Every structure is written in C-alpha cells, then in structure tokens.
Amino acid sequence: MNNSMSGKKKSGSILSHAVLILFALSALLPLSLVLLNSFKDQKSIVRNPLSWPETWHFSNYAEAWEAANFGRGFINSILLTGTTILIVLFAASLAGYVLAGNRIKGTKFVTVYFMVAMTVPIQLFLFPLYFVMAKLGLLGNVFAVGVILGAVNLPLAIFLMKSFFMNIPRELEESARIDGATTRQLITGIMIPLVRPGLLTVSIIVGIAAWNEFLVTSTFLQGQNSFTATLGFLSLNNTYNTNQGLMMAASVIMIAPLIIFFLIVQKYFIDGLVSGAVKG
Amino acid sequence: MQMRKATNYLLIAPSLLLSLLIVLIPGLLTLLVAFTDWDGVAVSPSFIGMQNFQEIFEDRIFWKSLFNNAQWTIMFITVPVVIGLLTAILLLRRKRSRSAYQLIFLFPYVLAPATNAMLWLNIIFNPVSGVVGYLKNSLGMSITSPLSSVHTALYAVASVDIWHYWGFLTVVYLAALRQTPGDQIEAAQLEGCNSWQLFKFVYFPSIKPTFSIMLVMIIIFSFLTFDYVYLLTGGGPAHSTEMLSTYAYTFAFSAFQVGKAASVALFMSIMGLLASCLYIWLSKNDLKG
C-alpha cells in the first residue's frame, strides 16, 4: 500500500518535471537556434539550421553592428527609454502619493480615468497625434517619442506607485505632520526613501516596455538618424534576407543585453508584473 | 490645512496634464475626425456624418478583421491560460527549482516583439533558411511556411504571440496561488481531498479575483493586438490575418484616409471600453481604498 502510494507519487513527480522541462525547452530552443546560427554563414544555415557550426564566423557580429547602425541605435534607445523613465517616475510617484491617501476630491474619478487610459487602444490617439507632431516638426525626435511613451505607460506606473504608497503606515505621515513637516519635506524626506523599491520596480517595468515598444516608435521615428536599436534591427530584414548569419548575430545583439539585464533585476521585474496583476 | 489641500492638486497635475495632452485630447480629436473625410493634411476637412462608418460596415475586410480578432480572443483565453495554470500549479510544489523555471519561462516575454517576430520569421518559418526550409528541402517533407497560407497564417502568428506571452501568466497565477491561506490547504488535506479537489475547492476560489482580471485584460488586448501581426504578416496573405488594428493603421498611413482610420479606431475603443467597464467593476475593491 505504502509502496504503491509512493510509487504513484514518484511517477507523478517525474511527469510534472517532464512537463516543466518541455515548456522550458519551448522557450529556450528558438533562442538557442538564434545563438547557434549567429556563428554560421548563409550556406551552412540553409544546409541545416539545426547543426553545430563547422567554422565559426565571428565576423557576423561586426558586420551586423555596422549594417544595423547599432552604435547610433543603442544611444537613441537609451535616450528614449531614459526620457520615458524620468517622466514616469516624476509624474507617477506624485500621483501615486495623492491617490493612495485619497487626498483630493476627485480621487475616484481620476482613478477611473487612468484605468480607462490603461486599456484604451493606442490607435485611438495615434493618428491625430501623428499629424500634430508632423506639424510641430517632432517626427524623428527621440525625446518627444519618449514623452509619448511616458504618457502611454503612466497609468500602470501610477497604480504600482499607489500600491507602494498604500503600504506606508498612515501614522508615519501623521507624526511627521505633528513635527511640522511640509508636504515637500514629507514626500522627499520620508515617503520617497520608503518607496524606493517601488521606484526601482516602476523604472524597470516601464523601461523594458519603452525599450521594446514597436507601434509608437516605428510610427514616429523616421529617418535613419532617429532609429532606435529595434528599428535599426528591423531595417536589416529586407536587405539581408539572404545573409541569415548576419541577421542572427543582430538578433543576439538585441537579445543578450536584455536577458542579462532581466537576470540582474529579476526580483523587481517579477514584483512589478505580479503587483500589477494579482488581486487580493 | 487649506494650503495642504491645494498642494495635493498640484501634485496630481503633472500626470493629468501629460495624459490630457497625449491621450485624451488626441483621443477626442479622433472622435471628431471619425465623422470627417480628413486626409491628414487638409486644414478644414468636411463633415460627412456617418459615411465612414457606413463604408467600413459595408467592407468585407472590416468584418474579416473583427472575426479574426474574435478568433484571436478565443485562442488567447484558452491556450496560454491553460498552459499558465498548468505550469503554475506544477511549480507550486517545486520550491527549489521554481525561480529558475520562472526566469526561463519569462525570457520570451521580456524580449521585444520585433526581436521575437524576426526570430520566428527567419530561423523557424523561413522556407529557405529556417527549420521549415530544412524539413522541406533536406528531409523532403511537403510543408511550406505556415505564414504564407491563408488557412494557417492566423494560427502561426497567434502561436508566436502565445509563445511570448504564456510565461507571464505562469508568474501571475503562481504568485496568486501562493497567497492561498495555508490553513485552508491543510484543512482540505485532512478531509482527504485529492489534488484535483484541492485545486477546485481551495486554490481556484482563492485565485479567482486575479484569474478574472487577467481574463478581462486578455480580452481587451486581444481586440487591440497589433505588433506580432504587423511584423509577421502585415495582415496578409489576402487579409487572412487582418486585425482591426492593422486595418485602421493601413487606412491612416498607406491610404491617408485618416477619417476612416479614426472611425475604425473608435470602434476598437468602444469594444475596449465595454471590457474596461468589466475591468473597473471587477477591481471596484481597489476604488474603495
């Protein structure tokens, strides 16, 4: 009896491991194929994309870096993402503080507004915005696009910051008030240091979203000089269809920094995903 | 005291102003433009009433897009949800390997749609240099790129998007499952519940609020889906993967019929708004806070 129970448990455990490994492989195999083929030339990729490289073409990387203009692209990506993060941190932390404490008359209204704003399609405001930006000569301006992505990511950031502020005990604020702290002192001296993990979480979630964004970025950034790394990478696709080794090397240049960054900040990233979605 | 109240309005102002200028006002402009024949250039477009809506409702491709969005929704509320739940439940008991699995599952989710789409396009689906090409040319199997057939393109695009998305659900579901009160689990085990009963009567009720919110979010975003479709097929072949979003985008930037694009965008927004109401209703507990 006991034996068969543990036998059953064991086979269940093996099965569950097998399922998890299968799904892990489904995530990893396509990425490994990219890495593997980034060292091969077109001929050997066409012969067999699943084979180990016979000769290692490290030059694919240098060629890809040149062809996609990644030097320029990464600088633009950093400027754009940095703009988005700074704007979102400033606006969302202040708004989160106000909404968490129910400090204004229209708290409910503002909350509903940002909930709707979070789920509205980008196409709802994209077209008029595009033609206004064109009029203002702001197409191709990475900072302007950074601001737009700031507005797009703002609602989620506000709700994240709000939940971080709500975890601060009310008494802390009250005692600071009794000691005569102004709102400014209260926020910069007490609140902001306490929600620092929240600021980090918001920066990471919003930063990755802005870095990866496609619809807004590709619509507004025209002209090679304003291309982000992503757009530079995409511009390869038509020209280098017959040089897949170069395409794969460019993909690795796109993928590797992001995966490394993700592994470094994993705790904050997962915290952000979860607190944005899990309802208690 | 009075000053302090005024300060609070000042603090919310940057967020409201930013959203007003970039989301709300252009959004209202879309509402206006939807009833005009604006081409994006003209200074004074003429008001044409419901004509844009009449024309899109008569367009076969509009209905095709709507139907594709509906199919997309059905695929997304089933496949990734089932995979996410299954893997989350399996990870619940793997205390040591849990975080490693979570990280691996999130890899595709963290990467840009542009990178993921190009990856599948070039090394998997490509009929010359991809795995598909290898199976066809070297092993002699009779397959073509699933993206090039009107019968399979939608499923192929959805597969790539689902491949990138399901890990997110695993992480969210797992976090919710872990909040299930321990005493409830113990009580159920003492009562002799088997694994399925434990899930059905203890774990699932506990994660239900999260589960419903995620379902609503999936429905909303299924009606807005753009990136993978646009990058992998651009809506083709023969509109077989056309979505409302790509349909609107083509009107605005290929045909310069901005009025029409706006009317499609408005239609999408109304669909989204209905789902948003559901979302707000489900998170009404947050509003009390």
Which residues are covered by each model-predicted region?
Chain A
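Short, intrinsically disordered terminal tails adjacent to the first/last structured region
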Residues: M1-S4
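A structural signal for multi-pass alpha-helical bundles of membrane permease subunits
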Residues: S6-K8, G12-G280
